[in-house]
Amino acid sequence: QGHEIDPMAVNGLEQALQIALTTSQFYRAEEICDLLIMDDPVNLELLETMRDLTLYNGNYEKSLEIVGKIEKLKGVDSNLLIQKSALYEELENPGLALETMYIAFEQDSQNVDILHRLVTLLIGQERSQEAIIYNQRIIDNHPNDSRGFINNAVMAMSGKKPEEAIQVLQPHEERFSQDFTVQYLLGTAFYQIKDFINSKLHLSKALSIYPQSRNTKHNLALIHDSTGDWVESDKLYIDLISTDSTDAQAYNNYAYSLVERDRDFEFALELAQNAIRLEPKSAAYLDTIGWIYFKMNNFDEALRYIRESLNIDSSNETIKEHLNEVIKVRAKVNGQAIQQVENQD
């Protein structure tokens, strides 16, 4: 039984809801929708609007409550169970998220969305053997759905087996030539085994499918760096920085690329300073700025930053090599300076 509200007031609230939705005042819309549901608690359209609003506003506890009400009116279906599972995951309850998907699987064991969601949760909870079993159902029953092959590749990559990921995806690359994730994973796997030609090929395809992918641009820039194609890597770094002034990784990688080429030390230093400003406790970024100071013969600053970097990541071999190089060169330069003074005397 709903609370009785004057019909004129209901009409006014409905108009207010439409205005709030049209003007993107979603928190206000949620408040108004809540009032309307109090008057008409079995109005499915209102409940679905409320669910969408609470999801957008990140009010996941409320979303879960609303999905439960929708479920009572419509009955249990796979989409609602998937939504409930996703909400449990957002609310950091992985056990209930998985339990909900087992219920969904019992109701429809061939549904590819249920299977994929189940596999994704199992991978996330490091239950790879179970994930493999359910994922095989996707491959067997839905061979034209790329997600089964992608899941196997993701598990291989998670296990640091890029060659296995390539073996999983490469036989199907033509069939999924316009699938961003397939091309991206192939490019990343080839990059990890230092096959830069194939890596560049697949990541370029991925970028053509989804030009806004920043991860793809980052990886392509690293490959162009590795192959000495610096015109292309510089273009990508400039694009990344110009489209997101908070991309610390782009600042750092561009700076490191320049200093490794012995180019534009002042500009590289400016880039590295931006990276440090954004992420002051990053061992990699502290090492980069220290290495730039070393190349600029400012050994004291170089030592300060690289030692700080090593304190954060004491097992990093590159940072250790940089520190040893700075100490060695500084000792040599200081020795030469002392020798010159003695010769003058």
At which residue positions do the language-model features occur?
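Alpha-solenoid helical repeat scaffolds
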Residues: 1-345
